[in-house]
């Protein structure tokens, strides 16, 4: 049998987090977080946000599920989920998602674990992800960014796309080709190194969510990602994560573990709650959206889908918590949550019509343009951390034992 109830200790934690939010979180902080991002994006913030996250870190809430010997609390993933859920419902995201911490714990040396994990939890170190390239997106193993050994160093040359937070992160978690003669999945290595080493150039890449017409300080986050160039960047071999030429498995494992977490489910829930609150709290003359049977049916359907996503998240966390083999579950979660987000977007546009397209700064924008923000965000949610199409292929192969739908070749590896 499965027990879906939270423990008394977990419920106590939830009450503590709610009380903390009530006492410390302001509308101004939520707005600034919309601009600058989550807990792993510490730079570029005002003093109020910095003070808030200082208090969060003092309580150890960012590292609940990490081992005590590396600065965490040695707690369980469900408790970590509870903290993330309560903050997300209040309007801000706190997570170490995308930090590379799971991969470091699994594949790093003891020295790397001791150095990076406590500093990731404290916020002293933050990562950006250097995986995708202009010619290596869905087929990531076709990457061309090279790392050539020179004695005890590696010299890195190439380009990475969609390196979100590269302009603010202290370090990069980078995948590069270290053996051009090997099969394309075999000649890859993972490196972790500071972003201030010579030879790195970061250029902004603005997404659909950028809103240049909004009043200063009122645009929503996720508008900027980056393209990053590496020109004879020299790093020491100690920057290798895992073995040389064995980085594909490390990178894939890290991405899969990173897909386990509340954040993807909570994005869907927050969008559900946005539309539910609008429907319940608005009246247009004699017309009440909340009394429209078609709208009520659609909202109920979306709520059920959100609960399915929640259960998938909890199941994935339970598998990892027990130490069982974790193969396709993260990919399945990655398929369901973004597609649920798209269905929310479709419901928003059907209910609000042209008002769903009005951005913050428009005179008739609803709730500061949150719905337009959600609509635009849904387009990229199916691509981040692996496209939905690739995730389906992984579920078919790893979960159902079916053959791959794609051919594996060496093309693109050179």
Language model regions located:
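Alpha-helical interface subdomain recognition
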Residues: 2-90, 94-95, 107-112, 119-124, ...
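Short, conserved phosphate-binding/catalytic loop or strand-edge motifs used
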Residues: 97-102
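FAD-binding core of flavoproteins
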Residues: 2-5, 95, 114, 118-284, ...
